[in-house]
Curated annotation (Swiss-Prot):
It comes from Symbiobacterium thermophilum (strain DSM 24528 / JCM 14929 / IAM 14863 / T). GO terms for molecular function: rRNA binding; structural constituent of ribosome. Keywords: Ribonucleoprotein, Ribosomal protein, RNA-binding, rRNA-binding. Belongs to the universal ribosomal protein uL24 family. One of two assembly initiator proteins, it binds directly to the 5'-end of the 23S rRNA, where it nucleates assembly of the 50S subunit. This is Large ribosomal subunit protein uL24. Pfam families: KOW, ribosomal_L24. CDD domains: KOW_RPL26. Signal peptide: none annotated.
Length: 83
């Protein structure tokens, strides 16, 4: 994988293009990553011991790793282009 957990990344394609966030989880077998604040979906949950009322919870869904790029890599490209 070209990104690691806790790394800051930028979404380069898709509906969340341009958004930045921290990588919360890496799923190497599926080639996907979960990024904070990106690809937020609403999940309907049944009542449980943890959440007695159940309800609708907003959570981040995984996106394909090819749709994100490390912020450090982008900064390096800008510096190379500038100087």
């Amino acid at each position: 994988m070209h990104v690691k957990k806790d790394e800051i990344v930028v979404v380069i394609t898709g509906k969340d293009k341009g958004k930045q966030g921290k990588v919360l989880r890496v799923l190497p077998k599926e080639n996907r990553v979960v990024v904070e604040g990106v690809n937020v979906v609403k999940k309907h949950t049944k009542p449980s011991a943890k959440n007695p009322n159940g309800g609708i919870i907003e959570m981040e869904a995984p996106i394909h790793a090819s749709n994100v790029m490390s912020l450090a890599k982008i900064e390096a490209k800008k510096a190379k282009k500038k100087g």
